[in-house]
């Protein structure tokens, strides 16, 4: 069985371009055969809590870590297992105020965790433990921001994934959703071709 972990971070359940891209991706993934399954984590349905002091103590083995595990720690364990068990990763990420939604940032705060998804191998040296595996980041934005000084989404996602050992994520961008001069049908054809290409490369 080949499993794709798909993480939704759009607050919108309808009219979302990243959810539309995710639907296209899911259809392409399933078209590869019955042995291709998709596991979905929808952060709009279950918003991650912010990391609290007790959870940080458990993450880093600080004083007080012997206290009973928190519900937040249990969520972290679940999400990390899903991440580690997946054969490929896909993130549906709308750009909110030039960066990623806070729900996805909170999810990443729970999965970027010492001794689980990265470890210290020498003074100042760290090693990611969650890769290698293919990763896809599907973005949508009202303007044309990708790879400009206003784009804080792509650099952050690249850094966060690489820190866990997941290098060179593929980005598929549906840009200009608020612009009248950009044809959404043409955009859909372009992203569909790019998503199909990524699936077949996995």
UniProtKB/Swiss-Prot annotation:
The kind of enzyme this is, by top-level EC class, is oxidoreductase
* Free-text cofactor note: Binds 1 FMN per subunit.
Gene3D superfamilies per the record? 3.40.50.360
- Asked if the record carries the keyword Flavoprotein, the reply is yes
Tell me the residue numbers annotated for binding FMN.
10, 95-98
Which EC number applies?
1.6.5.-, 1.7.1.17
* Any GO molecular function: FMN binding
**Which metal ions or organic cofactors does this protein require, according to UniProt?**
FMN
Tell me the keywords, alphabetical order: Flavoprotein, FMN, NAD, Oxidoreductase
Catalytic activity reads: 2 a quinone + NADH + H(+) = 2 a 1,4-benzosemiquinone + NAD(+); N,N-dimethyl-1,4-phenylenediamine + anthranilate + 2 NAD(+) = 2-(4-dimethylaminophenyl)diazenylbenzoate + 2 NADH + 2 H(+)
Q: Which family does it belong to?
A: Belongs to the azoreductase type 1 family.
What's its job? Quinone reductase that provides resistance to thiol-specific stress caused by electrophilic quinones. Also exhibits azoreductase activity. Catalyzes the reductive cleavage of the azo bond in aromatic azo compounds to the corresponding amines.
Indicate the quaternary assembly: Homodimer.
Put simply, this protein is called FMN-dependent NADH:quinone oxidoreductase
Annotated source species: Alkalilimnicola ehrlichii (strain ATCC BAA-1101 / DSM 17681 / MLHE-1)
């Amino acid at each position: 069985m080949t499993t794709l972990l798909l993480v939704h971070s759009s607050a919108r359940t309808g009219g979302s371009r990243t959810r539309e891209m995710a639907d296209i991706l899911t259809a392409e993934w399933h078209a590869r055969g019955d042995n291709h399954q998709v596991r979905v984590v929808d952060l709009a349905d279950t918003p991650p809590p912010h990391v609290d002091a007790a959870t940080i103590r458990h993450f880093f083995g600080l004083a007080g870590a012997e206290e009973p595990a928190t519900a937040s720690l249990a969520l972290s364990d679940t999400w990390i297992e899903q991440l580690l068990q997946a054969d490929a990763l896909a993130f549906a990420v709308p750009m909110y105020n030039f960066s990623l939604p806070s729900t996805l940032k909170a999810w990443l705060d729970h999965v970027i965790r010492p001794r689980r998804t990265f470890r210290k191998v020498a003074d100042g040296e760290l090693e990611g433990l969650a890769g290698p595996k293919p990763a896809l980041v599907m973005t949508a934005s009202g303007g044309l921001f990708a790879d400009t000084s206003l784009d804080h989404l792509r650099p952050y996602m690249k850094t966060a994934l690489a820190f866990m050992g997941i290098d060179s994520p593929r980005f598929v961008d549906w840009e200009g959703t608020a612009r009248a001069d950009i044809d959404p049908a043409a955009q859909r054809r372009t992203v569909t071709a790019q998503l199909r290409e990524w699936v077949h490369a996995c």
